[in-house]
Amino acid sequence: MYYTEESLETLKHSIDIVSVLGEYVHLKRSGADYKACCPFHDEKTPSFIVYPTRGHYHCYGCGEHGDAINFLMKQQGYSFSEAVLFLAKKFHVDLVIKTKTKESSGQDSKECLRRINKEAERFFQYCLLCLPEGGEALSYLYKRGFSLDTIDRFQIGYAPEQRVFVRAMEERGISVKQLEWAGYLSKDWFLFAQRIMFPIQDSLGYTIGFSSRRFKEGGKGGKYINSPETLLFKKSRVLYGLQFSRKRIAKEKRVILVEGQADCLQMIDFGFNCTLAAQGTSFTETHVKELVKLGVSKAYLLFDGDAAGEKASLRVGDLCQVAGIAVIVCRLPSGQDPDSFLMQRGPEELRELLDRGEDYLSFLVWHKIRSYEQFTPREKARVVEEVIQQVQHWGSPIMIHEYLRQLASLVKVPEAAVLSYLSSIKSATEDKGKKADAKEVCPDPEATAVAYKGGKASKKISPRMILEADVIRCLLFAKPEEEFVPATVRHYLSPEEFHCIEYRSIFVMAMNHYNEKHMLPSMDDMMALVWGTEAMTLLVDRRINTELMRDIVVQAIQKLLDKHWRDRKRNFCHQMGKELDSLQEYVRLSEERIKVSLVS
């Protein structure tokens, strides 16, 4: 802990818990206390009670309880330190740092940096609003749609020439050396001279850096110059606009992501106060992890209407999907960004645009299809394969299955074909080298069984099971008008030839349906009997050439009957001391052997 017990105790007695919780829940007075519907679970009758005199809350519905610090940690996702700093700032309590240690020394440096940033922020805003040289920057902001209220709300400012800035900071007790340490000066050059200044704040509202924008033609440096990284400012972790959007994001579990600071501020100013932007870099996995910490379950991507914006949507969307965040892509008209769209069409049309957004998978498929001049079957197969390569990393197996079903519908291919390709990817990754062994049929199933990994569990798959899968696969992929396959299977095989319970179930269903309606049941109906099992994975692991379907089914039946005959003979010989004492059994085995010869 960085702060003394005395200062924390002072903070505790300064906190008005009703003032804190009242920003997040609708409190109603009930005698000396307050009540509300609990923010931690769904309810219609209020059972969430706040006790002002004790500085405590308790929900008699779900049992949640604690003080203001506990509430911020649970409801807003703050760490303990963040909650303490937030409350200290809100109630104007100066926290006293403990006696110097390595940790407290670093904390002391952070406090010093916060003070420098705050003084700079106040000075920049003063320059924009009060000095003649800030008039040109103010005019530029007005033309971009920034009102005085907006400028004041977001503490937007203007940085003058270096000598003016340095002199003003020295008057406030901040030396040139400290300005260099804080990232304002670099080799005696003021990074932000004659630029519009957008403060970068953390989730608690403390200014941790600046993003500056050039507004004059011919100005020094690039269009944007951001503060260098410091003890407080880490570009890869900062989500711009979080201090204004955190409350609504925590409540609604959704976020709107945009590219630039101006876009973000205008969105928030127009009431879309669940908007965030990356800072200084493009969105990264670290940013997405921060969204997950905030409890975000859905992200709307509202990037610029150009090729770069489309590319960003593809990349950020995949990062979010992998993290378990559902993505909605909202495409702006060509050449527009959220800022210009709001200025030209207003917030209502933007809400409609957000409502019309498409899920990320549909956007991804659309993007890939559009890259081909002609969408032939070969291109369709390529799109399916490329998309599956991404989808296989999106969340739980159940969600992946749902995405694959949607993919099959979007590109109009059988679900089983999509599942088959996914299984082939997994097989190639998990079991390289074993696939060829699994295709060989040897006399002794125990000696030649192969390890097959088709799911969470690993099971020994015998050659017999592989043969049974070959037969069932023919039934699955047989064309509706195909008579030879079901008729041949029905004539030569019976349920006892199938040792795998799942394959036997498919065989029985298929034959009953064929006998009754003279056609096979749908592939989906048959696959439902084995869904989620290793039998299914083995079934869809191999592709089948439908042009050679007749030859394949005949060979599969022949091998299965031959296997069945040899297994029965081996078992019989073992039981009878390798002598065929029973003429009746010998005759029956001979008849089965004849059947094999007839098929071949």
From Swiss-Prot:
Positions of CHC2-type zinc fingers: 38-62
GO biological process entries: DNA replication, synthesis of primer
EC number from the UniProt entry: 2.7.7.101
Ligand binding (Mg(2+) 1): E259, D304
Keyword Transcription carried by entry: yes
Catalytic activity: ssDNA + n NTP = ssDNA/pppN(pN)n-1 hybrid + (n-1) diphosphate
UniProt KW keywords: DNA replication, DNA-binding, DNA-directed RNA polymerase, Magnesium, Metal-binding, Nucleotidyltransferase, Primosome, Transcription, Transferase, Zinc, Zinc-finger
Cofactor binding comment, as recorded: Binds 1 zinc ion per monomer. Binds two Mg(2+) per subunit.
Alphabetized InterPro entries for the sequence: DNA_primase_core_N_sf, DNA_primase_DnaG, DNA_primase_Znf_CHC2, DnaG_bac, DNAG_N, DnaG_primase, TOPRIM_DnaG_bac, TOPRIM_dom
Residues bound to Mg(2+) 2: D304, D306
Quaternary data: Monomer. Interacts with DnaB.
Domain description: Contains an N-terminal zinc-binding domain, a central core domain that contains the primase activity, and a C-terminal DnaB-binding domain.
Descriptive protein name: DNA primase
Species in which this protein is naturally found: Chlamydia muridarum (strain MoPn / Nigg)
Classification lineage: Bacteria, Pseudomonadati, Chlamydiota, Chlamydiia, Chlamydiales
Gene: dnaG
